[in-house]
Amino acid sequence: MTTQAPPTSLLPLSPEQLARLQAAVGEFSPTQMAWLSGYFWGMVNQQPGAVASPAVAAPPPVTVTLISASQTGNARRLAEQLRDDLLAAQLSVNLVNAGDYKFKQIAQERLLVVVASTQGEGEPAEEAVALHKFLFSKKAPKLSETAFAVFGLGDTSYEHFCQAGKDFDSKLAELGAQRLLDRVDADVEYQVQAQQWRQQVVATLQAKVPAQSTAPTQFIAPTQSTTPAAAAITSGGTTTVSPYSKTAPLTAQLSVQQKVTGRNSEKDVRHIEIDLGDSGLRYQPGDALGVWFDNDPALVEELLALLWLKGDEPVSIDGQNMPLAQALLSHLELTQNTTLIVDKYAALSRDETLIALLADKPALQLYAKNTPFVDMVRQAPSDLNADQLVGLLRPLTPRLYSIASSQAETENEVHITVGVVRYDIDGRARSGGASGYLADRLEVDGDIRVFIEHNDNFRLPANPETPVIMIGPGTGIAPFRAFMQQREVDGASGKNWLFFGNPHFTEDFLYQVEWQRYVKEGVLTRIDLAWSRDQAHKIYVQDKLREQGAELWNWIQQGAHIYVCGDANRMAKDVEQVLLDVVALHGAMDAEQADEYLSELRQARRYQRDVY
C-alpha cells in the first residue's frame, strides 16, 4: 500500500525546509536513517538547558537488510515470514524487493539476508537481474564489514538447481563478506527447510545483535512486494485483502474454453475464460493466475497397473490419510520427472540401464526432462509398494499463467492463454498436467481452483501518456491483451507498439480480430509480425526488432517502457541481445555502456520481463 504525503500546508516545515530535508535523507542508508531518528528524538526530549551531542546519543540500531528476489512469489512469502520473525525478536529489519534495492549502498550493509529464487536455466529472478549484474561487475565493492546468509529456492527438475542462490552466496563471499550460516538450496517442497532456516537466522542474529529496547524501526521500500502478495491488491490508494491464496484457492467455474489456433496448426493454444462470480477476487494487468489441477485418471490407472497396485492402498499425504489412487490423482506430481527421482528409482528397481545413466550427468538430465515417471516405470519395471511410490513422487504444484484480461473490461472474469503440451513417448500420447486438464478434462461450468499471483515487476506505466513497446511471441502475447484492454478503458494517450510472432499467419495469429480492431481504432499505434515458417528463411520477433532499430531507439528516447513475455531460455535472451545491439548502434555506445544503459532501464522499471 502506498502512503501519500500530507499537504505541505499541514506540515510544520516551510516548502524550502521540506525540500532540503528530502534532498538530505536521500543520501543516507537505512542504518544511518535509524540512527538519525534516535538522534533527533533525543534532541527533542533532552532536559532544558542541555546541549545536544551526538556523542551521547543512543547507539544506532543494527538493521538487518532482507532482500527478496522472487519469481513466482515463494521467495517473497518466505522473506515476509522471516521479517515477521525478526520483528517478533525485536530486531530492526528492512525488507526490500531486489528490484527496488539501491545496490550501490551494499557496502554499507552490516547484516544482509538474501532469499533468492532461480528461473529458467540458472538465471536469477527477473527482479534480481540488475543486482546480480552489479555484484558480478567491476563496480562491486569490497564487503569486508558485511555478514550474510542466503536461502536459495529452485527446482531439481532443472539442471542448474538453485543457481541464483549459489551465485549470490559465492559472490558475496568472494567480495569479502562473512557467512552467518551455510547456504540452503531448497527444492519445490521447501517449507520444512525454510522453517528450520528461519529459526537459525533469528537465533544467529539474536546472538550477534542485542534486541532493541523499544519497538524496532522497520524501513520498507515503497513496493507492494512487502504485503502478502497472494492476498492483497492495491486499487485507488487502498489495499484490499483477499481471503484467497495459493494455499486457500477460490473455487471458480470454467465459462469458455476455445481453441484459438487453426485446424492445421502445429500448436494447440486455448483461450480460457473463468467466472470468478461474486468472490471479489481482484487482479491487475501483469498478474498471473495460479491453477490447481488433477492428473489424468487414465495416467493414474496406467501407473497403478504397471506397479501391480490396486489404488485402494491407504497412504498419508501431509498427515491426511487417503487411498493411493486419490493421492496420485490430486496430490502428487506425475507429469514432471527429476534427476533425484531417477536416482532413487534406479536404486529401488535395480535397473542396469538407469544405474548406468546416473554416471552420465548430461544424459541423466535429458532423460529426466523427457521421460515422465510413468514411462520410466514402464521402461524399467519394479515392484514398488504404495508407500515407496508416494515417497518417490513430489507434491503437486499449481501452474501459473499470465493473465490475458483486464478487470476494467471483463469485471468478474479472468482470461488466460494456454499452450497445450502434447507429445508421444513410444507411441503413447502424453499431455501436460495442467494444460491437458484445462483443454481435455475440465468441462464448461466445471469447478476450478485458482488464485492470483501478483507481479509488481510487470506493470503498465503510471503515466498514461508513456509509450509502451510489447514483445510477446506465442502465448507470450497474453499479458499484452490485458495491457491493451486496460489502456483502451483508461483512454491512455501513450503510443502502443506490439511485436508478435508464431509459425504461420493463417494458423497461429492469436486474437487476430482484436489486434486488427485496435489498429483500426488507433489504440495500437504499430504492430510488427514475424511468421517463422511462412518463408524459407525463418523470421523471429528479434529480427523484426533489429529491422526497426532506429525507430525503436526513437521510442526509447521518448521514454517508452519495454515489456517482454514468453520463453526465457531462447527468445528472451535473443531479444535482450538485439536490444543491446540497438542501444549500442543508435545510442553510439560500446557494449559495456549499452549493458549499463539497459540495466538502468531495468532499474527504472522501463524494461520489464515476464519470462518462463
From Swiss-Prot:
The gene coding this protein: cysJ
HAMAP family in alphabetical order: CysJ (MF_01541)
Biochemical pathway: Sulfur metabolism; hydrogen sulfide biosynthesis; hydrogen sulfide from sulfite (NADPH route): step 1/1
Name the record gives this protein: Sulfite reductase [NADPH] flavoprotein alpha-component
Enzyme class: oxidoreductase
Higher taxonomy: Bacteria, Pseudomonadati, Pseudomonadota, Gammaproteobacteria, Enterobacterales
The family this protein is said to belong to: Belongs to the NADPH-dependent sulphite reductase flavoprotein subunit CysJ family.
Ranges for domain Flavodoxin-like: 64-202
Record's cofactor remark: Binds 1 FAD per subunit.
GO MF annotations, alphabetized: flavin adenine dinucleotide binding; FMN binding; sulfite reductase (NADPH) activity
Alphabetical UniProt keywords: Amino-acid biosynthesis, Cysteine biosynthesis, Electron transport, FAD, Flavoprotein, FMN, NADP, Oxidoreductase, Transport
Source organism of the structure: Yersinia pestis (strain Pestoides F)
Residues annotated as binding FMN: 70-75, 117-120, 153-162
A family per Pfam: NAD_binding_1
Domain FAD-binding FR-type, residue spans: 247-461
GO biological process terms, semicolon-separated: cysteine biosynthetic process; hydrogen sulfide biosynthetic process; sulfate assimilation
Assembly and oligomerization: Alpha(8)-beta(8). The alpha component is a flavoprotein, the beta component is a hemoprotein.
Cofactor: FAD; FMN
EC number(s) from the headed UniProt entry: 1.8.1.2
Residues holding NADP(+): S532, R533, K538, I539, Y540, V541, Q542, D574
InterPro entries in alphabetical order: CysJ, CysJ-like_FAD-binding, CysJ_Proteobact, FAD-bd_FR_type, Flavdoxin-like, Flavodoxin/NO_synth, Flavoprot_Pyr_Nucl_cyt_Rdtase, Flavoprotein-like_sf
Entry binding sites for FAD: 335, 369, 399-402, 417-419, 423, 432-435, 612
Function: Component of the sulfite reductase complex that catalyzes the 6-electron reduction of sulfite to sulfide. This is one of several activities required for the biosynthesis of L-cysteine from sulfate. The flavoprotein component catalyzes the electron flow from NADPH -> FAD -> FMN to the hemoprotein component.
